[in-house]
Amino acid sequence: MAALADDPNKVWTIDELKTRGEQVYNANCVACHQANGKGVPNAFAPLDGSQVVNGDKVHQIDVLLKGQDTPAYPGAMPAWKQLSDSDIAAVITYTRNTWSNKAAENIVQPAEILAARSK
């Protein structure tokens, strides 16, 4: 998605984020989490109905920036910190509004990713 030069202070609409997020998801996430968000049983975690995706967005941001190992899924989630702030915000927003997910905090802006990187 190349957009490391994106302005992290730009405020995106939810539709812009979801459109870009779908592209980011298809390029980087679909191999493990699948097009339907169901993951691969006993290998890669599902995102559809996930507590991480539907919970506190700060935790999901942290997972994308730092990766995560969980005993339930031996396929570890890698860190995606090489993606731009806009791409990470977009893919998180996409997952929080796709499949059966109805996250209360349903939008993430690039500035939130930028702030999380400095923690």
Model feature map: region roles:
Residues I14-V40, V53-K66:
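Sequence/structural segment immediately N-terminal to covalent heme-attachment motifs in c-type
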Residues V24, N28, G67, T95-T98, ...:
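Alpha-helix boundary/capping residues
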Residues P46-A104:
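Extracytoplasmic electron-transfer domains, predominantly the class I c-type cytochrome c fold
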